[in-house]
Curated annotation (Swiss-Prot):
Name listed for the protein in its UniProt record: Large ribosomal subunit protein bL33c
PROSITE patterns in alphabetical order: RIBOSOMAL_L33 (PS00582)
Primary site of residence: plastid
Key word Chloroplast present: yes
Amino acid sequence: MAKSKDVRVAVILECTSCVRNGVNKVSTGISRYITQKNRHNTPNPLELKKFCPYCYKHTIHGEIKK
């Protein structure tokens, strides 16, 4: 029997501190990463600690809607 392809989905992670603080005055932009998640194992929105080149530090990146 064939497996369903809808289990793994692509998600976009966006820096929460850049969005909250407006954008850094030195360089404009918001850090975004693209990754995949398994909907069965992780039904809640994904949050990972990643490096933000605009904040120059590791910050929490949260899943956003497409």
